[in-house]
């Protein structure tokens, strides 16, 4: 699913809202999540999951085309941990081993 499909589904479930308003709401939610992550904050959507950022330290890497060793700088990467309810919907009937 892409963002425009999400907007269409939400708009169809909420016929009292204009399509452009739904698009603005979806964009606002995504912008707020992005801004929070950029500020180093964690975003938790209970039952769905939690977004956070993790630090990847600098390391030596290898250029797959040439085989040369290259230096990869430290960077921050987004991370998503699924919530219990989402895991249960994806794997119905399985006991949750993490919690």
From Swiss-Prot:
Disulfide bonds: none annotated. GO terms for biological process: DNA recombination; regulation of DNA-templated transcription; regulation of translation. Keywords: DNA recombination, DNA-binding, Transcription, Transcription regulation, Translation regulation. The keyword Chaperone does not apply. PROSITE patterns: HISTONE_LIKE. One of its GO terms (molecular function) is structural constituent of chromatin. It holds the Pfam family Bac_DNA_binding. GO terms for cellular component: chromosome; cytosol. It comes from the Bacteria. InterPro entries: Hist_DNA-bd, Histone-like_DNA-bd_CS, IHF-like_DNA-bd_dom_sf, IHF_beta. Heterodimer of an alpha and a beta chain. PANTHER family: DNA-BINDING PROTEIN HU, INTEGRATION HOST FACTOR SUBUNIT BETA. NCBIfam families: hip, PRK00199.1. This protein is one of the two subunits of integration host factor, a specific DNA-binding protein that functions in genetic recombination as well as in transcriptional and translational control. Belongs to the bacterial histone-like protein family. HAMAP family: IHF_beta. This is Integration host factor subunit beta.
């Amino acid at each position: 699913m892409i963002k425009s499909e999400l907007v269409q589904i939400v708009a169809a479930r909420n016929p009292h809202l204009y399509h452009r308003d739904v698009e603005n709401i979806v964009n606002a939610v995504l912008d707020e999540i992005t801004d929070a992550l950029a500020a180093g904050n964690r975003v938790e959507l209970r039952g769905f999951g939690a977004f956070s950022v993790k630090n990847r330290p600098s390391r030596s890497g290898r250029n797959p085309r040439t085989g040369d060793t290259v230096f990869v700088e430290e960077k921050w990467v987004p991370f998503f941990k699924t919530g219990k309810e989402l895991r249960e919907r994806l794997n119905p009937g399985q006991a949750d081993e993490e919690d």
